[in-house]
């Protein structure tokens, strides 16, 4: 799957911003057919970072949400700033 088709958009909520600051996690809405491995590869390729783990869930709206934890040597705040979240 094309990395740019896997990631649909970042999530910008109070919880998502809190996770960026406290747990070094980014939150995205992703393609419903994407696997955790697809999501990990897409994030690593697009943002040039290393991913520690990916947690996913299906929202009541039917969208797939991914919580992506970055390795400690990378900053989620930096990526969020590049995306224009701050």
UniProtKB/Swiss-Prot annotation:
Gene3D superfamilies: 3.30.70.330. The keyword Zinc-finger does not apply. It holds the Pfam family Ribosomal_L23. Keywords: Ribonucleoprotein, Ribosomal protein, RNA-binding, rRNA-binding. One of its GO terms (biological process) is translation. Belongs to the universal ribosomal protein uL23 family. Binds to 23S rRNA. One of the proteins that surrounds the polypeptide exit tunnel on the outside of the ribosome. This is Large ribosomal subunit protein uL23. It comes from Pyrococcus horikoshii (strain ATCC 700860 / DSM 12428 / JCM 9974 / NBRC 100139 / OT-3).
């Amino acid at each position: 799957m094309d990395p740019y088709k896997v990631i649909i958009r970042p999530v910008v909520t109070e919880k998502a911003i809190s996770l960026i600051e406290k747990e070094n996690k980014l939150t995205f809405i992703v393609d419903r057919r994407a696997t955790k491995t697809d999501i990990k590869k897409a994030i690593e390729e697009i943002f040039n970072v290393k991913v520690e783990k990916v947690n996913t869930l299906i929202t009541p709206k039917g969208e797939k949400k991914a919580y992506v934890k970055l390795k400690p040597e990378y900053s989620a705040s930096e990526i969020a700033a590049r995306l224009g979240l701050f």
